[in-house]
């Protein structure tokens, strides 16, 4: 698909529901003691995998993704292996859940997911008493023999919300308390939701302490996904004739790293929280920002914006001076090696960028000429290059653009709504 330069970008929009929160709402409602009602769930390939696995384990769902009733039942051992598709969140969070049930399960995924490391969840869950068998002890497919678990104190080697969540979910049914200590703070949806559901959870800095507990069903409305909004917010800042407002979007402080970095760069940007419903929800406004300054992304913000970091490179193209991202080696372990895919494709578009093992550096005030790019089936990279096309000189041809359906099925539809060509 060829994305051509836009004359003007303007509009008020709401983005699809939050993917991270949808996964957790589905899982926690299946673990609750009584029924739950969930509103505004994101239906995409990743969240369908979580839903289908829970259904195969015995959970009953009624209604559609706009309003879903969830009737939990004790999990029963499934006969078939459980398919996680392309979803790392499904795999890692469900590993934590399944580790705490005395039954045998097998998780498998597509070719991309089968290359992503799972040792990081296997290790703490084995310390708690579960048994795992995986390809090279690190990759899917992965067999889990659940057990009655014991709580542990665990220092995660990387700041990862998925690893932290896997251990906390396992800890719900363990004997004794579970403690997770991270090297830096990662997104906190799991502990925030558990605390709101009455589970004894204490958070001090990067340390989370959880006591085993049961909880009742709940009602929740999922806010818009800040990671999806990010593409439009960045477009609003770098396009020479733009004004964009995103409403009903989640503004959890562990997810607003990109907004903080854009402020540091001098973007014409503001956001406000308008309501709290288990999670803060609000509005983001952005307009053309001709005086962007390059920035070294502060290390503590890196885990809070891991999915948005490649967009910083796009901001850096139009900023004055150098923009540097380091300590982000985690980007190489996503749906693609995002550092390599970013650098290779930016060079194809005529942008000079330097690659590091753990990040990249870009010198500003360049232009994006245009050309053809291959996001390698990675939904976030496909969306990034589409935004690049709108601010390019000649347009950008995005190969395999349909992969955006992994997280944002109506991305191009919303883009057409704000673009005036």
From Swiss-Prot:
Its EC number is 2.5.1.19. Keywords: Amino-acid biosynthesis, Aromatic amino acid biosynthesis, Cytoplasm, Transferase. 3-phosphoshikimate binds at residues 19-20, 24, 160, 162, 307, 334. Pathway: Metabolic intermediate biosynthesis; chorismate biosynthesis; chorismate from D-erythrose 4-phosphate and phosphoenolpyruvate: step 6/7. InterPro entries: Enolpyruvate_Tfrase_dom, Enolpyruvate_Tfrase_sf, EPSP_synthase, EPSP_synthase_CS, RNA3'P_cycl/enolpyr_Trfase_a/b. GO terms for molecular function: 3-phosphoshikimate 1-carboxyvinyltransferase activity. The keyword Cytoplasm applies. It catalyses: 3-phosphoshikimate + phosphoenolpyruvate = 5-O-(1-carboxyvinyl)-3-phosphoshikimate + phosphate. It is found in: Cytoplasm. NCBIfam families: aroA. Belongs to the EPSP synthase family. This is 3-phosphoshikimate 1-carboxyvinyltransferase. It comes from Thermotoga petrophila (strain ATCC BAA-488 / DSM 13995 / JCM 10881 / RKU-1). The lineage of its organism: Bacteria, Thermotogati, Thermotogota, Thermotogae, Thermotogales.
